[in-house]
């Protein structure tokens, strides 16, 4: 992510960065920020859609910002709308499977897979900081995108920015 350094002050500009609301944010500038100019759809296999973007995780108290270049893959047959449509068709054919089964299916596999392609760590003033990004931290911050979990919010926001519709509203 060379050349992608960003400062705490820049992240607070809503025309370039969107703050991703989180229950763990203190309200003092910490949290996840989506670089709005970086969101783009990329080539994906049939039945999938893919989006790349850059997100920043701000931790002002630690004088640290982590920049992450991420890619999310969306299985179109796992969207909530698609699963509901399949379930409704099964009901019409006499199947008695309860609707809660859809929730369980989504919790088992949300249909969204995320990967981190690159990353960098910076001080709050935007200068590069020599620090690795650990897998445990990624799991705590953004991955995996589990249905019903807060980490599901970011890939859905990216999808809506790229395609104009929420992933789970896709038929």
Please give the residue ranges for each predicted region.
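N-terminal secretory-pathway/extracellular module detecting exported/lumenal segments
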Residues: 3-68, 73-171
């Amino acid at each position: 992510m060379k050349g992608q350094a960003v400062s705490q002050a820049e992240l607070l500009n809503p025309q370039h960065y969107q703050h991703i609301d989180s229950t763990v944010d203190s309200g003092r500038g910490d949290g996840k920020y989506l670089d709005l100019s970086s969101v783009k759809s990329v080539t994906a296999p049939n039945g999938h859609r893919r989006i790349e973007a850059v997100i920043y995780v701000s931790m002002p108290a630690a004088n640290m910002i982590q920049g992450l270049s991420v890619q999310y893959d969306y299985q179109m047959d796992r969207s909530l709308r698609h699963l509901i449509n399949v379930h409704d068709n099964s009901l019409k054919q006499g199947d008695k499977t309860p609707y809660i089964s859809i929730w369980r299916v989504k919790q088992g596999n949300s249909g969204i897979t995320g990967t981190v392609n690159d990353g960098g760590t910076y001080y709050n003033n935007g200068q590069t900081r020599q620090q690795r990004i650990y897998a445990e931290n990624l799991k705590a911050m953004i991955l995996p995108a589990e249905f019903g979990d807060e980490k599901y919010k970011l890939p859905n926001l990216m999808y809506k920015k790229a395609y104009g519709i929420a992933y789970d509203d896709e038929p």
